[in-house]
Amino acid sequence: MAMVLSAIIGSLVLALSGCSDQSGKTEKTLRVGVITYSQDDPFINALTDELKAYLKTMESEERRIIVSIKSGNDDQQEQNEKVEEMIDAGCDVLCVNLVDRTAPYRIIRMARNENIPVIFFNREPVKE
């Protein structure tokens, strides 16, 4: 799971870094927002630590990667608010581990309105 998520994020990093104006020595900053369902899950904590470490290896002189990790604390409404905070903070990509697998619609709508890619991991969205 960590390798798949890392590969997807890596692809997005490369794709999004191609979107910047690279005239001169301008450093591109890529902001990755990771929102988990709970901060009490050891597997999710290990996964997010691995993702953060992997993204650190992808940094270069031209590309800086900032990873912000927040928890929904087992509450879908709180997770939606955290996603909105990440969008307002300027995240370029969101990685979401849903609290409620049947409630991804608000997150998708918020991200789509800002043209931000969303990766759902470990908990696949499902219909009610």
What is each PLM-predicted segment?
Residues T26-E27, E61-I65:
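Short helix-terminating capping/connector loops at secondary-structure junctions
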Residues R101-E128:
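Flexible loop/hinge segments that line or gate small-molecule binding clefts
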Residues D92-V93, P117:
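Structural signature of beta-strand start/N-cap positions in the alpha/beta core
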